[in-house]
Amino acid sequence: MKKINVVILALSILFFAASCSKDDPTPEVDQEEVGTAKLIFTEVEREAHGDHAHYNDIQNPEVVTVTFSGADMLPPVGEHLHLEVGKSYRLQLVATDFAGRETQQTFVARADIHQAFILGAPANSLSYEYGDIDANGQALNVGVTGYLTVNALANTFTMNYVLRHLNAGVKGRITAADWNNASYNQFTGENDLDLKVSVHLVAEGDHDH
């Protein structure tokens, strides 16, 4: 009887060890760790089509780029962007990991748990449309690519680009109209990126201050 009990105990230990090895997979390397980030504003032509617009590349576009780095993901000291009233810009996020490899497509690949919000501008001074699409041409509303239109003059303000890593199931409650929702924290999750830069909305050609 004693030998039988020993055998049963040994088998139980083996079964428990096998179960644990199946239940505890090796953690994946986090592909969303960001070392640097850039926001690139490229002037485009906005072509209105009723309730939506097409955005077309133009020759010799104005391009404005700001890079964020360091532990706090800050722009260069004194960085100050000018965007011109009446113009539309393709706003692109380019993110790299700590090895310098681009990682922004990770956010698009996980579109069900990511969405960007663009905050800080005076009311009605900007409008924005998400531009991310999947392989089938379906809109994803992530914000790695989008289109920003400057509607009105505005004194300098702090533009805040927040890329939210949402809890499961939350994205279904968010619409494209929430792009500048100051209460974005109601959409539970954590921020993968929280980028801030000084922006001034100016008349065409007025870049003197």
Regions found by a protein language model. Give the residues of each.
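Bacterial Sec-dependent N-terminal signal peptides
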Residues: 3-4, 13-42, 209
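Extended, polar beta-sheet/loop recognition surfaces of beta-rich domains
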Residues: 28, 101-153
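Short, solvent-exposed beta-strand/turn "edge" segments of beta-rich domains on protein surfaces
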Residues: 28-29, 78-85, 150-151
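A composition-driven surface/loop motif
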Residues: 34, 39-41, 45, 52-56, ...
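N-terminal edge beta-strand
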Residues: 55-84
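Internal, hydrophobic beta-strand segments that form the core of beta-sheet-rich folds
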Residues: 89-95, 153-181
